[in-house]
Amino acid sequence: FRKVDPDWYLEEMFIKGEADVAILSTQVLMDFYHTGFVNPERNAQLVKRAPERLVPLGGVDPRMPDAVNEVERQVTELGMKGFKWYTAEWRGESRGWRANDPMVFPLYEKCIELGVKNMHFHKGPAVEPLALEKFDVRDIDEPSSLYPELNFIVDHIGLPRLDDFCWIAARSPNVYGSLAVALAFIHKR
């Protein structure tokens, strides 16, 4: 993932594959990777190759001191169309954060100001050593009510917390599920 050749990616995705459009997620994960697992600059470069077929998502850790400015930079300078949030991301002693933490609200408000509506949250299968409780979908409920102008997309439909996701999505018109990874579970082994 970190060293994908752009030519290979575009050929596999759009020439050999059946995709019409792809979402490029930024995956910060700075405590594990010096420049992030997938950084927004790399995604911005790839989008230049196929702007009509690639939708770039930025990524910011809300615990960063300059997080609001970084959201603005990624939108205005790099062309990010939404954000992918990793609530289980480590940062120093912190082992994650919650989408309903008031420290995140200024980032949502900056996105609204910039006209960016789509907030993706990694709420799927947890891998070691990340904490399972930081992938809990229930923290989406409050901000989706407070910010009805934003779309809260629960990536991987909250697996393995599908019941909680369904209850929240059923009553919140701005909560959606992304089936990435989840589709693999429809096939029998």
Model segments located where?
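Helix-coil boundary/capping segments in enzymes
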Residues: 1-189
